[in-house]
Amino acid sequence: MSQLRTTKAGLVACGMICAFIFLYLRNPGPEEAEAEAEAEPTNPAVVECGFYPDELCSALFDGKKAAPQIAQFCKPPQNSEVPARLRTPGNCSRLARGLHFITRPLSAEEGNFSLAYVIHAPRELVMFVRLLRAIYAPQNVYCIHSDENAPKKFKSAMQTFVDCFGNIFLSSKTQKVAHDNLRRLQAEIDCMRDLVHSPFQWHYVMNLCGQEFPIKTNKEIIYDIRTRWKGKNITPGVTPPANSKPKTGQGPPKPSPDENSYTAPNTIFKQSPPHNLTISSGSAHYALTRKFVEFVLTDPRAKDMLQWSKDIQSPEKHYWVTLNRLKDAPGATPDAGWEGHIRATKWRTEAGDGRKGCTDHDAQDTCVYGLGDLPGLIRLPAFFATLEPSSDPLVGVCLERRHRLRALQQAEVPPEPHWQFPQQSHFNSQPHH
């Protein structure tokens, strides 16, 4: 009898421990939360990862303090779904279904408001396809430009992919893209020309690189553009004060992490700006109306400024915001500042208390988003966030699954089976030492 009581006590204790672990991620109380903050990651022989990744992603988005620690151990084998699909012979319909592309407009509003995208494809094909899968809609149109020196294998895979979609095409011109060089700006303008000549009647165009990922759904982006901007361009930036207008030998104003602020010039003008333009400075990211794009492609001031921009640093950070300050430009916002949240940016100076999760810094002094950033990231008003290659892969996985879930929840049409991502999987993981 004594042995039986001991066994029962052991079973009860085991059950309590299991229940505690189950609730540890989901809803810790104040005492548990305090203990989590002080706890150090352990290295058990085997980690119970549960239904991966949805349970863990949910805990990360909810800000459970134990979740990033558990994520250190729960890393399944690298997903090779995208390259496998591109290598497998088959028709394009099978490719779209296999990669879970949404193939119908999800609402009448979206179907009647086409967006265009100019996308710089990185050399990481999987990251690019995941971005395109998230922002893809059959009523939208996508122009892809890549470095002309990209590997032939990458170019071939890219061509195979875009050939399966009538609304995705490669730019008619290629550039040797460098970060601080006119070639990036020229590549985007080349794509815009292709988009204007395409049969798609798009309303706005936005630019992305393959390392970015949407925080907002297509429906949410359209709602913000239509209700807040109402035919205006979005070019966040700043114009120098009237008493500090740059002259020859001076540079344009430098964007500052502190919105609506102006800092000293950082570039030297070899020549005065054409047409006596006042050079503004801001984000290289934009949302532009079709009429404004047509203006950029034909107006002498825009053409002359493009030629003049060859001699300045990071011209893409000055070109769009300067032209959008011209009062006679279609959709212009002459008095705008940093309004318009296109890309989320966390500056290194902001990575203090309450801004945890900054795991690295890129060359532009901005933080790379980590697992600890997810709760705050999804609450930002920005449309997109940059996911550097050094980011934890789970950051992109969680954002992708959340984005697809929200898109289908907002849909006004019944979802097709292939729009859903594969069911969750349950596995144990050997810790990574």
UniProtKB/Swiss-Prot annotation:
Disordered as annotated region, ranges: 233-275, 413-433
Associated pathway: Protein modification; protein glycosylation
Presence of keyword Hydrolase: no
Disulfide bridge partners, by residue number: C57-C209, C143-C358, C164-C191, C367-C398
EC number: 2.4.1.-
Main location: Golgi
Cellular component GO terms, alphabetical: Golgi membrane
Location within or outside the cell: Golgi apparatus membrane
UniProt keyword annotations, A-Z: Disulfide bond, Glycoprotein, Glycosyltransferase, Golgi apparatus, Membrane, Signal-anchor, Transferase, Transmembrane, Transmembrane helix
Membrane-protein topology: Single-pass type II membrane protein
Start-end of Polar residues biased regions: 258-275, 421-433
Principal EC category: transferase
Any one Gene Ontology molecular-function term assigned to this protein's record: glycosyltransferase activity
Cross-referenced InterPro entries: Glyco_trans_14 (IPR003406)
GO biological process, one term: protein glycosylation
A matching Pfam family: Branch
Side of membrane Extracellular, spans: 26-433
Residue intervals annotated with topology Cytoplasmic: 1-8
Transmembrane spans: 9-25
Residues carrying covalently attached carbohydrate according to the record: N112
Functional description taken from the UniProt entry: Probable glycosyltransferase.
UniProt family annotation: Belongs to the glycosyltransferase 14 family.
Protein name per UniProt: Probable beta-1,3-galactosyl-O-glycosyl-glycoprotein beta-1,6-N-acetylglucosaminyltransferase 7
Natural source organism: Mus musculus (Mouse)
The encoding gene: Gcnt7
